[in-house]
Amino acid sequence: MKFFALFIYRPVATILISIAITLCGVLGFRLLPVAPLPQVDFPVIMVSASLPGASPETMASSVATPLERSLGRIAGVSEMTSSSSLGSTRIILQFNFDRDINGAARDVQAAINAAQSLLPSGMPSRPTYRKANPSDAPIMILTLTSDTWSQGELYDFASTQLAQTIAQIDGVGDVDVGGSSLPAVRVGLNPQALFNQGVSLDDVRSAISNANVRKPQGAIDDKTHRWQVQTNDELKTATEYQPLIIHYNNGAAVRLGDVATVTDSVQDVRNAGMTNAKPAILLMIRKLPEANIIQTVDSIREKLPELQTLIPASIDLQIAQDRSPTIRASLEEVEQTLVISVALVILVVFLFLRSGRATLIPAVAVPVSLIGTFAAMYLCGFSLNNLSLMALTIATGFVVDDAIVVLENISRHLEAGMKPLQAALQGTREVGFTVLSMSLSLVAVFLPLLLMGGLPGRLLREFAVTLSVAIGISLLVSLTLTPMMCGWMLKSSKPREQTRSRGFGRLLTGLQQGYGTSLKWVLNHTRLVGVVLLGTIALNIWLYISIPKTFFPEQDTGVLMGGIQADQSISFQAMRGKLQDFMKIIRDDPAVDNVTGFTGGSRVNSGMMFITLKSRGERHETAQQVIDRLRVALAKEPGANLFLMAVQDIRVGGRQANASYQYALLSDDLSALREWEPKIRKALAALPQLADVNSDQQDNGAEMNLIYDRETMSRLGIDVQAANSLLNNAFGQRQISTIYQPMNQYKVVMEVDSRYTQDISALEKMFVINSDGKAIPLSYFAKWQPANAPLSVNHQGLSAASTIAFNLPTGTSLSEATEAINRAMTQLGVPSTVRGSFAGTAQVFQETMNSQVILILAAIATVYIVLGILYESYVHPLTILSTLPSAGVGALLALELFNAPFSLIALIGIMLLIGIVKKNAIMMVDFALEAQRNGNLTPEQAIFQACLLRFRPIMMTTLAALFGALPLVISGGDGSELRQPLGITIVGGLVMSQLLTLYTTPVVYLFFDRLRLRFSRNNSQPESITEP
């Protein structure tokens, strides 16, 4: 009593405390960062290594395996995958959530150093690492185009000037430059001219290497001066290399230009990048795992004017893709939804109270509670994101509940003629415990979420804490500010029955009278109600088992990614044509705003595309509908496939797959994996629950297998090293020298000119100079035959691995897809040597599925414990929790009605319903117990009276929660796919629970009371009957 009086009789202090809470919230709001979702990125580090010309199998065995053995010893590595292709290896390390990315990077560098002695000596550079996830979609893509600059010059400018500057911006993890390669002097050899002059390819390589040497020459000193010695020992351009003497034939000088075409070109001619229909260089910017996407993008945009000053007028720099506009639009939508929810909740309160002055009291509690929450969010390191703002939207219906309960009870005393301050004090004292019980039991629902680990726990933590803080502030406001305002603003009035004669008041009176009549009938047919209650429990179980499930709602971010997978024997020229064809098909779609793409590098038969869709206001289709439409047109392109997927704010794992979900096959027997992977992929592709099924196992590339005749080689004076060096010199784009420039270093690249490698007959033109100085054709000591070879070799851990990626057809849930895959694997009878498991997002979904029921039961158990402590009873918490089955049925039926799968967002809704619907029972049980104790009423009379007296606040609080969630259901625009499942779940659960719990709760109350009475009699303790 003294606690409440302290605030009621000191209005100035109470108001100032509320203002202080509000001001702290305003300050916190201005300081909070903005993000699409809570920070849930796994710490990921990518290790890269190269050995030009090495086959994928060589890269896997000699480079990937030693590194994997060393990296695998690092603490906190949750998953390690690698992919080795022609001349390159990429290892992806995913760490546990609690692993610091900077500490992990130091351990990675130490592991690379430890493995250095086991790596091949011919590697041009040490392995490097980056703190970025290559499977993440870029947060921004910049393009460079020019009508006068070559692609190599643009690439050089982008990598040496722009990429270096952008990489230094806070939050940027990686800047990947694509579309070409660094400038280089290319030496295209003429094998016939070399044969005629008697010059071997090794002679050419040695001559070029020896002619371009950068060594210190020292200095000369005399008594008064010092001169540095400098020579023209470096050659920098193709023009300078052409007259280079590489050999003497019968006294005549043989110059490089006589046997080769020397050009200023690029290191790797098998690269191409495009934006819309124009050749371009792409700068693909990815953020650090712990960075905020909006802050990082804003920092890049702030830097762009400075970058523009570095760019010549003949180069056009454009932002081809920026993920932040849709994120900002989504947050604006949810902020508007929050405002609408607040307005609807206040409107509900006004309809019930029919007084502007009375409505103002709970209306003040809403902004104070919501705004004050921002301060706690800032202190906890949270952000303004879709989930935290949805928590505040839902909180509008909660934070007003406590004020409504207090206000309604004080109003009842005022109508009985009590003075305002006395009514405020008495009314608050009567319902103080009720309000405390409702708030603490609601917060208790979220305790299991706070203790939940992994990605789901990280994702839901901000939601749970934000909502809990809002409820806590609401509890404080409803027990301090609300009674103070009631005591000083409201006046004694006539009973409601005399003032409510029309409109909504008459409707509410009629409902209350009808409820009283129907409740009498129900209390006389309790067995039927018991059957209904048991039926809802069974229906809950059946609906949960049968409803389609997914991990997270599919988002429409307005950005698509596409992976091109062509025939494994396709040439680069043909692949570049496929890229152009695919880009034209996509560019012609009316929903597409911009498209960029690139191909080439170590995997000639693959490419990537990034597609920006028009804003939601400019297109009538969702991203998935655009993909479905494009899939039909893209399927008509022969010889290659383009797999499209909508970019999501949550992507788990480091695999660069061509679809949203993955199923990984592992085996210690590579031959078994290669035998069974095509069978499994074919079986999965036939499933109607899957779409765009593809695999990263590519072991049917065209290969020309050379077989040496070692006896002939020995007789001719040729060793294997010389033969292998010949092939590397001829076909490996061998980097044979380095050109040092002030801004960068460039390579001299040697290979047989492409004019002489149009078919396999090029091998017949190759020769080796033996130990006697004679030119021996390759065909003299080797024969060749076509064969199949892998284009890539993949590992997970230290096992051979293959990843089958898939998308979901429209209308199919992830649970249906995973169940279909498990059935298919069982039917195929895959041997134990090949192990299959879901990876990435699908793996997290499986883990979440296994813990959902446990999480719900833990929440219920926590609420029971809290209520049991508050009521000092084992029985009354069960009465209150009996409201939950009807809410679960309503939520699951609503999801089925709207064809929405049960996702992590819907799980949040279920958890919220556990806290919401029990409020009705708490208000009934509290008043029934009070009536039994102080009114000398029978249990039947007490619960009946409690139901009638609390009907009005129950209706008010339920409608406030329902209208607070309703905007989530009907909202459209960006991000609506995240908001709607939450709103659907809550609205469905509230409607069903309101219809049933008004009748089931009193029946359950009487059942447990009779059970308690019978138990007390059996134990000869009749005195305990009257105890609460």
UniProtKB/Swiss-Prot annotation:
Assigned protein family: Belongs to the resistance-nodulation-cell division (RND) (TC 2.A.6) family. MdtC subfamily.
Membrane topology summary: Multi-pass membrane protein
SUPFAM superfamilies hit by this protein: Multidrug efflux transporter AcrB pore domain, PN1, PN2, PC1 and PC2 subdomains, Multidrug efflux transporter AcrB TolC docking domain, DN and DC subdomains, Multidrug efflux transporter AcrB transmembrane domain
UniProtKB keywords: Cell inner membrane, Cell membrane, Membrane, Transmembrane, Transmembrane helix, Transport
Lineage, top ranks: Bacteria, Pseudomonadati, Pseudomonadota, Gammaproteobacteria, Enterobacterales
Transmembrane segments: 3-23, 333-353, 360-380, 387-407, 431-451, 463-483, 528-548, 853-873, 875-895, 897-917, 953-973, 984-1004
Name of the protein this chain belongs to: Multidrug resistance protein MdtC
PANTHER family named in the record: MULTIDRUG RESISTANCE PROTEIN MDTC (PTHR32063:SF34), PTHR32063
